[in-house]
Curated annotation (Swiss-Prot):
This is Chaperone protein TorD. The keyword Transferase does not apply. GO terms for biological process: protein complex oligomerization; protein folding. Involved in the biogenesis of TorA. Acts on TorA before the insertion of the molybdenum cofactor and, as a result, probably favors a conformation of the apoenzyme that is competent for acquiring the cofactor. It comes from Colwellia psychrerythraea (strain 34H / ATCC BAA-681). Its main location: cytoplasm. Belongs to the TorD/DmsD family. TorD subfamily. InterPro entries: Chaperone_TorD, DMSO/NO3_reduct_chaperone, HscB_C_sf, TorD-like_sf, TorD/DmsD_chaperones. Pfam families: Nitrate_red_del. It comes from the Bacteria.
Amino acid sequence: MSHVSQETAQEISEEREARAIVYNFLSSLFAKEVTSDLVAQLTSAQGQSFLKSLALDPSLSASVNEINTKLVKLNSKESLLELAADFCGLFLVDGRTSVSPYAGQYLSVEQGGEPSEKLSNAAINESGSKSKKNKAQLFGELHQQMTEFLTDNKLQIHSDFPEPGDHIAVILAYIAHLCVTSGSEQQLNFINSYLMTWLSDFTQQVNKHDHGQFYCFVADLTFEWLKVDTEFLLSD
């Protein structure tokens, strides 16, 4: 291999790793409540360098800066508990102000991945109440498909993350894996089929119900990042 091609290969590898880091970062924010350890990581010199690099893209800067502002204020047990309550109210309980983080509640496998009737209202490692119909979609066909994807890639959901495979945190973590193991076409096909088909609706619901706004900015950043990344994959 020539010196030039070696450099090109290294650049591609570094680019893939950088994209995977972003997906894992977003996955971690949807997987569980923000902890003091995560705040410490993101407000450290290395964490700030990462966030500043993300903010260099004009379409991401507003959301990144708002998240950073919120992180700085998470400097007490009380502030973390308040944010944890927001997370719980949005993603862990059923209710008028909750938002489903599961792809299967937005998409229908029978309709070829097209959006179905909408609800109004870090996850993998290597090796009003919803109706009965909506509850049945949990651990449904999209969960089964994601589980098969994970198994085929020798991945599994963390034992301390008791959620279906079509949870947004699992999907984002799986895309991080694809970033470093698969070609652009496979990545793009997966993103367009399993995330972009419902992410806009999810983001709108979070913006409607998250009065604390931290997860509004996280959802906005996720949606804008996916748009940036899919454009990148199309041009690759």
